[in-house]
Structure formats: structure tokens, C-alpha cells
Amino acid sequence: MQEDRWSYLWLILGALCLLFSNGKWIVPLAAWLAPLLLIRFLRTQPVGRGLLIAALVHGVIFYVWYVDVIPAGFVPGGLAGFMAFMALMSLIPLGPYAIDRWLSGRLPGFAGTLIFPLSTVALEFANAMLNPMGGWGSLAFTQTDNLPLLQVVSVTGMYGISFLIAWFAGVGNWAWAAGMDWRRVGRGILLYGMVLSLVLLGGGLRLALWSPVMASGRMDGAVERKANRGTAFFPPETATVRVASLSGFDYRYEGEPFTPDDARHIDALFEATVREARAGARIVSWAEASAMIDARDEAALVRRAAEVAKQESIYLQISPYFEPAGERAVNKSILLTPEGEVGWEYWKSRANLLEGTVLGDGNVARADTPYGRLAGAICWDMDFPNYIIQAGRAGADIMLAPSADWRQIDPMHALIARVRAVENGVSLVRHARGGLSAVYDYQGRTLAAVDDFVTTVDRTMVAQVPVHGVRTIYAAVGDLFAWLNVGALALVVGTALRQRRGYVRS
């Protein structure tokens, strides 16, 4: 254990940074500083006391982050089940600190700086794979406005950013413990600085030299689709297509009875669809559950949408939501083609256990069009990187992800989807009922945005969207980077356990 009379000051400062490093209020720099300070606190405290205090701090802050983000009704078991779920989830971000505190003294020198990033990535990966709510809480989601850094997710997935942030904390504490003696720590600091600089430089070059070539004005006709989507995650030159997306004009939650107001609302959506089509939109997308209907009216809704799509020569994605009597609710995305045919019929496929809707078949929707290959998912589906990777592997160019949020996850939920777009080389149209709607290109630039809680008059969103996506290394190799971290951590833990057994025998 290291001695530091300022130990509790680092705890206080670390807790303040932690509060603003995720959840409702994100200050990107705080996400880098919080682990640096909290690791310092833990390494200067007895193991048991330090971890107990850290667990309490994480529990309180996690509750503040997510108390209104996760509706209590989503978790079975009533209030007790909800509190147990919150307590369990708060332990996930604590895990890397506990592993670091256990192993930091067993792996000396610069190699010890890797314990915290390896364990951070391993636990984030496990969370994304096993958590029924998806990969919420990743450090990567705190850095989405840093576009040069964000480009690394096209290679490593979201875990590359998390690794760099956590490694900063590991290197910083190693240098701190050495008294910042440059002769001892200089080469290690330079190595970390070189890695981070190369990531930022590579991302900056990708943004500057291989960005989408934006066509000016609106596109009224088809665009020839190129077979080559680019190589090594560098895009071909591309044109754009005008995409319009529409939200609910009055926000309401699912599960309420169908009313005549819903019928009038659907009429307004069709009127807006025709208006945007005649203004040049070739693709029109409705937000999740925009069409609250009686189960018996689904066929009529689809027929009407098909007629509008054929009449206006557009691709129209509609979002019916209905609750058959005595059955689970149905949450769909249906794409109608300019020929009046159904291009896809997609059921929401993730978080259904919590929402209680009919489970989809587990395949991301896709359709080939003159404007590129479209892919489709719904809202919460975007929180699962191992699911949305299907879009990247299918060579999707534009992804339509109708969504429905609430104030407490605005804008957090949109930021998660932004990372998915860059990971998979797709431009993303995400229109949210009751939250931040945004269009991102495949490098994470914001092409359009509108927030239901800010805009009260017209929530239509229009953008010129690249018709060609780009292949990414992440889509090709999947979570290889995360698995390498898991393997390296297992090797370190195994070595530590063997050393412990040898010490006990002696």
C-alpha cells in the first residue's frame, strides 16, 4: 500500500469527476480524470476499507446517473427488484478498480499499467454481451464529440476508446507512484503518448482526407450504386440522397388505449410524408411507435402507406405499434418501396424481455435500393454492438433506426447509436419520439438534429445522407480487440494465482 496523506482528497475529487463522467451529465474530460483519481485513492488505502468506500461511492453515483433512466417498471420484482438490479449494475464499473487493486502489486513496472485497461475492456465487453439492456455505461459514449478519437471504433469497436481512457489512468498512477521521476517513467509516458497521438492523428487524417463527398442540393432521382464500398475503411466518392424523418407531434407512452387522436395523428404523419416527398425526399422514416393503432387496423395502415410510397415514388418506413387482446405488444418497422411493395417487415429484436414486446427473428432488416443498401433496426437494438454488426457485415450504406426515448435518456441514447454508425461504416437516420433525433454520417458527423423537448412546432428532420457507406475493420473482425483484452487479462490473473499458490506452499 502506498502512503498519501491526500488520499481522501483524491476520493472527493474522483467522486466529483465520476458524477460527470457518464449518465445524465457528461463532461468528457471528467471521464479521463475520474479513474486516475479513484485508483490513486484505492492504492493508498487498505484493500477492504478502500473497496468498501469505493463501492458506496459507485452505488450512490450510479443511482444518480440512472434512477430515472431505467424505468422501475422495466425490472421485474417491483421496487425490491429494481433496487437489487441497480445495486448489481453499480458493481460492474467497480470491477476494474477491484481487479487493479488486487493485481497492481503483482505485475511490476510499466506492464502493471495494463491491468486497469484490460479489466475495463473485459467487463465492458461482458456487460454488452450479457446485460439485457445492452452496452450502457461504456466510457466510449463520453467521447462522441471527439471525432478524431471516435474513428478508432471503426477498428476496435467502442472498446478502443475505453482502453485508452483506462490506460491513461494506469500510466498516470504508475508515474505518480514513482514520484514523477522522468528517468524512471519517461519512456512509458512517451509510449502512451505516442499511441494516443497515433490514434488521434489517424482519426484526424481519416476525417480530413477520406470524408464523404457531399452532393449539393436535393436529389430527385436515383443514384447509381457502386459495387465498391471502399477499401480498408476508406470510402469511394459518393453522392447523397435527401432523407426526411418524422416524429410524434404529441409525445405519449406505449400501452395507452388507442384513441381517435391517434387516428388524426396518423393522418398528420401521412400529410407530412407527402409534403417531404414533394420537397425532394426519396426516403421518409417515421419514429418508433409513431403509428399507435388498433391491432385490427394494421393491414389498412400498410395499404395506405404502400399507396403513398407508390404515388410519391419514395421508400417509406412506417412504425406501427399495437397490442392484440391478451397478447404481447407488437413493435414493428415496415419499409414500403416505390412499387408499393413491402421491402421489409421487422420486429424489434432486443430488450424485449424488459419491454414485453414480441421478439423479432434476430436479423437486422435490409433492402437494396437505388440509394444504397438500407438496413433497419429499432431504438434499443442499437445498444447491442454484437447485433448491429450485422449491418456492417451486410455492406449497409444507410441505417434507419426509428426510436422512442424519454427526457432522462436524452441525449445519451442518441450518442450510443452514433458509435454504432462509425463502428459499422453506415450513415444513421435515428428519429426519436420524445428525445434527440439525429442523422450521422459514417464518420460520426452530425448532419441534422432535432430534439422533441426543445422543438415544439415542427419536429421534421431532413438531411442529405451519403448513399455509400464504407467497410470497417471492426465489421470484418468483430470484437477481436475485446477478446484479446479478455485473453490478456486471463493470462495476468492466472499468473497471479500461480504465484500466490507458490507463495502459500513455500
Residue ranges of model-derived segments:
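CN hydrolase (nitrilase-like) catalytic-core segments centered on the catalytic cysteine
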Residues: 92, 118, 283, 290-291, ...
